[in-house]
Amino acid sequence: LLEIKLLHSVPLNSKIVMVRGTSVQSETNIEFEHYNLAPQKIMNDLLNRAKLVISRSGYSSIMDYKTLGTPAILIPTPGQTEQEYLAKYLNDNPQFKMVNQKDISPEMFNWLSISNSGKQKGPIKLNEGALINSLNNVGLTIPT
């Protein structure tokens, strides 16, 4: 399960907020601010403050990140050829980094991101706060 893999990969000193993207209650112990579903206003606020997003590589989500200039680690849903194609295509863009679900690890948080907007330069520091949007709409953002 992607949610569990992400939770085990996030550095322990991280301040994060999780948006799970489902009304189904989590079976994992989430010890930080989290939402099963977030109202659009809250999601907009979190995305506008984000330094980093970790997300599935769906078209609409990618368009949001591109518009905002937010660096994103894209994790395509296994077997979803459109998501796999989009993540591979964008992997050459310095704003995006593709990570396969099987390759999720703490090391992916060391990714250096220089977005086109200059919003983030240098190493991503998770202890500045983060948002994880998991399951169907997985994403991790670091609010400023």
Where are these regions (language model features)?
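Hydrophobic beta-strand scaffold residues
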Residues: 16, 72, 97-98
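C-terminal amphipathic helix plus adjacent low-complexity
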Residues: 109-144
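Short, charged, surface-exposed secondary-structure boundary motifs
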Residues: 27-29, 44-48, 83-88, 107-109
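Donor-nucleotide binding loops and adjacent catalytic segments primarily
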Residues: 1-52
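Short acidic active-site motifs
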Residues: 41-42, 61, 107-108, 130
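A donor-sugar binding/catalytic signature common to diverse glycosyltransferases
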Residues: 42-85
